[in-house]
Amino acid sequence: MIYAGILAGGIGSRMGNVPLPKQFLDIDNKPILIHTIEKFILVSEFNEIIIATPAQWISHTQDILKKYNITDQRVKVVAGGTDRNETIMNIIDYIRNVNGINNDDVIVTHDAVRPFLTQRIIKENIEVAEKYGAVDTVIEAIDTIVMSKDKQNIHSIPVRNEMYQGQTPQSFNIKLLQDSYRALSSAQKEILSDACKIIVESGHPVKLVRGELYNIKVTTPYDLKVANAIIQGDIADD
């Protein structure tokens, strides 16, 4: 089976003094989360589309789904965890408890606050994850990346054409991700906050799918302005 895991567990502290977590803020008069969910509903390959949100915001999430006529029976809401990977594991726990987990099951995990992903990106994630077990969505780095260990001096400058900026979705064979996560120590779980990094550290290759420059993560007030400009300028592909 193929699952979507929409990661809406953040509280949006970088957004500043706002009344709601960032995933519930509006762009073009509609919550960011709804824009994102609508992209996933269009993909018939998904058996279930699971939203993980803070426990105290589950009722609000269900209310906005009703308000914006998200009636697709594949859409479920579960409680997120204390961090990103725990949120993904909560989704996997839900899958295991409801359907069980088969060897070829795939999960496409995606930031709820990246509302501009395309059908191509989603479908390529599914295809590559089914074939290879793990995939990250990336774009080539445009700017030169510098590394500093003390935040004052440059210590190295990586070769730019080897650098990529990670986006989401990140997609996995569920058993591969679950087993790799369970093999981590508590200390490793604190450090390895990215699911793809967990797979890389396990020794399993992670394939790349081409993202889009406009597949932005809306985390700051500036991002919110950019997101509205993307919609109003009809920049993003369908």
Curated annotation (Swiss-Prot):
Pfam families for this protein: IspD
Gene Ontology biological process: cell wall organization; isoprenoid biosynthetic process; poly(ribitol phosphate) teichoic acid biosynthetic process
List of residues binding CTP: L7, A8, G9, G10, G81, T82, D83, R84, N85, E86, T87
Site features described as Positions ribitol 5-phosphate for the nucleophilic attack, chain residue numbers: R160, K217
Catalytic activity: D-ribitol 5-phosphate + CTP + H(+) = CDP-L-ribitol + diphosphate
EC top class named in words: transferase
Protein keywords: Cell wall biogenesis/degradation, Nucleotidyltransferase, Teichoic acid biosynthesis, Transferase
Keyword Cell wall biogenesis/degradation: yes
GO molecular-function term, one example from the UniProt record: D-ribitol-5-phosphate cytidylyltransferase activity
Pathway this chain belongs to: Cell wall biogenesis; poly(ribitol phosphate) teichoic acid biosynthesis
Residues the record marks as site: Transition state stabilizer: R14, K22
EC number: 2.7.7.40
UniProt similarity note: Belongs to the IspD/TarI cytidylyltransferase family. TarI subfamily.
Record function comment: Catalyzes the transfer of the cytidylyl group of CTP to D-ribitol 5-phosphate.
Family matches, as NCBIfam families: PRK00155.1-3, PRK13385.1
Protein name, per record: Ribitol-5-phosphate cytidylyltransferase 2
Gene: tarI2
